[in-house]
Amino acid sequence: RDHGVPVWVHEADAGRARGEGKPPTAWGRVRPLPLLRFLGYAAGRGGLRTTYLREVRTFTAGERLPVPGAPLVVAMPGHSPGSVALHVPALDAVVVGDALTTRHVLTGEEGPRPAPFTDDPQAALDSLAALERLDARWVLPGHGAPWDRGTAEAVRHVRQVTPAG
């Protein structure tokens, strides 16, 4: 925003990015020490303050973004209505953002698992089927270390650690 760099978001999250509303989300399980670390880290970097955007560029699922690597936008609704993964076949990678995490910021648990602060946890789990079909080796989450055992194994692990609901 301050440097004139365009921000791209899925059309379903454009209003949220502009500050037009966000539903409250459940935190899920919490462990005190990881929670305090997360809050301390976030507070020290301005992460507890929201800065809204005046202008965003939007995309939809199935598009290829006009950036290096031409990533394919894959719908992953659940964390938010406009959550997406960006598949870059040339790199054998998929950027999943908060569709899943490999280090849960509120519990400290590691390995692929659902992300906290998710609007619709069941939709997020259902969206994993799209990720499973991508067949990329590298899964790059918004939180936690890169996962290099493939999308199918990441999804299997998430389902294994997620209680049936």
Where are these regions (language model features)?
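Divalent-metal (often Zn2+) His-rich catalytic cores of metallo-beta-lactamase-fold enzymes
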Residues: 1-3, 87, 93, 123-165
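Active-site gating loops and adjacent loop-to-helix segments of metal-dependent hydrolytic enzymes
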Residues: 102-112, 159-160
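Active-site metal-binding motif and surrounding structural segment of the metallo-beta-lactamase
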Residues: 1-14
